[in-house]
């Protein structure tokens, strides 16, 4: 058995004295594991850092075997991903999200999204919004997608400001008003056709939205704890956006 694909490194584990088990995300094979011989060598260690894009050849006697990876670098961006807190936490948090999906289950659009986000994690302002959309995409692929296109009660497609915490469907201002205290906020930047950028308040609301449904549908039913990297990422992204929103300091007169 053999296949070749490009991949993004999600992480590695030691295997014996010199080898590692590498975990990668591929466009056509999904999340996949494989042994890398001499993976702890000085040559391979920089290549096998999380976030790097690589070329992978997988070989095994049978399809369900662990198999071996032969890996060549395509884009080494791990160094850049260590420059900001959002990038450091973000690459770990996205890896944890992808581990919620079955191994070897292809999700090509998630691979493409991961690749784009990794190229933009160095910009802490954009990183938060991209990460929220990634969480929504993972929820959708797990079968728990949110419907933010129209009001669940009236069918209206405008003035959508709430999300039902039970159904994950959008609710308009009028229909949701009597239940506002129990509703989740729908940030404007997540609405269909919206081009408005996130501000600190709306980004915080978006993080609360995805956190609620990840716990409701995934973490709690599976008895899982939320990955600590997400908390670090959320805090770093909000701080970065708050700094951007601050008015520029006036130069003191000489």
From Swiss-Prot:
Transmembrane segments: none annotated. It comes from the Bacteria. One of its GO terms (cellular component) is bacterial nucleoid. Keywords: DNA damage, DNA recombination, DNA repair. One of its GO terms (biological process) is DNA recombination. The gene is recO. This is DNA repair protein RecO. The keyword Isomerase does not apply. Belongs to the RecO family. Pfam families: RecO_C, RecO_N. Involved in DNA repair and RecF pathway recombination.
């Amino acid at each position: 058995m053999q296949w070749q694909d490009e991949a993004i490194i999600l992480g590695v584990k030691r295997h014996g004295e010199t080898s590692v088990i590498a975990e990668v995300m591929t466009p056509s094979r999904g999340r996949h594991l494989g042994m890398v011989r001499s993976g702890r060598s000085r040559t391979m260690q920089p290549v096998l850092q999380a976030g790097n894009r690589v070329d992978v050849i997988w070989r095994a006697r049978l399809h369900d075997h662990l198999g071996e990876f032969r890996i060549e670098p395509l884009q080494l961006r791990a160094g850049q991903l260590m420059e900001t807190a959002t990038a450091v936490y973000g690459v770990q948090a996205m890896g944890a999200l992808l581990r919620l999906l079955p191994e070897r289950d292809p999700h090509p659009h998630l691979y493409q999204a991961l690749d784009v986000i990794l190229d933009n994690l160095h910009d802490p302002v954009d990183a938060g919004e991209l990460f929220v959309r990634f969480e929504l995409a993972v929820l959708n692929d797990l079968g728990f997608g949110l419907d933010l296109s129209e009001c669940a009660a009236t069918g209206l497609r405008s003035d959508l400001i709430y999300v039902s915490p039970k159904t994950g469907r959008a609710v308009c201002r009028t229909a949701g008003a009597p239940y506002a205290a129990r509703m989740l906020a729908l940030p404007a930047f997540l609405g269909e056709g919206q081009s408005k950028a996130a501000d600190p308040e709306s980004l915080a609301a978006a993080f609360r939205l995805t956190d609620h449904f990840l716990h409701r549908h995934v973490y709690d039913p599976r008895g899982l704890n939320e990955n600590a990297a997400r908390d670090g990422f959320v805090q770093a992204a909000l701080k970065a956006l708050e700094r951007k929103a601050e008015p520029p300091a006036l130069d003191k007169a000489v």
